[in-house]
């Protein structure tokens, strides 16, 4: 390739199911990248610049809520996404919402953005074949229940006077043939339960320039094989996903809304001063 070319495309395809886990490398690494970037976007959305240290399990509720020295600036809401063992917003009506039973309503939650400011919390739910963004006080698709609280891993609704919980990714159990989940899904479940395990596969750190997010630095973790199989290289700087700028709050929210439906992914990274598109086709044929 000549030095004058500014773009480079790396193509990886996932087509053969039930092979060794390395065949799922693009899917797995992409799942990790999306999971962690969403975590970071949630924390950095409102320009709260907090150092991330996964070795100290920075995603635990203790770290996220530990007292800080008073600031001269007005306190901004903190956001979390997926898996934080954070208490449900105290401003929500009702009793102990953590004890709300799982709802039998056939509703699917595909994304949650929890906030210490309830008015800024967002739930993404399926409505037919489309996804809608809802907040506390809104009715669920179909109007059967009303949203009263949004937690990092569940939605609390009031249905016929009773508080019920709708878990994130509330998929009905698969029936029929062998329905074992692919490694990428197992990995996503593992990371939601133990986010610190990301370090085994990938190190991602936000890069700030003049107090502005300029991208996410990607490096291999303790298990570098999956990182290299995906087409990534050390010190790649992720800046966009499917043409949406990961550094922009509104575009990042669009990425979050699209995550459950993505089948093809183009991750744009800066490498040695040039932009590179890494194409990942996530197909089971």
From Swiss-Prot:
Under the heading SUPFAM superfamilies, the entry gives: PDZ domain-like (SSF50156)
Q: What is this protein called?
A: Type II secretion system protein C
Instruction: Write down the membrane topology.
Output: Single-pass membrane protein
May I have one GO cellular component term? Answer: type II protein secretion system complex
* Periplasmic domain ranges by topology: 47-285
Supply the source organism for this entry.
Klebsiella pneumoniae
Keyword check for Transmembrane helix: yes
Lineage of source species: Bacteria, Pseudomonadati, Pseudomonadota, Gammaproteobacteria, Enterobacterales
One Pfam family this sequence matches: T2SSC
Q: Which UniProt keywords apply?
A: Cell inner membrane, Cell membrane, Membrane, Protein transport, Transmembrane, Transmembrane helix, Transport
The stretches that face the Cytoplasmic side, renumbered to this chain, are 1-27
- GO:BP terms for this protein? protein secretion by the type II secretion system
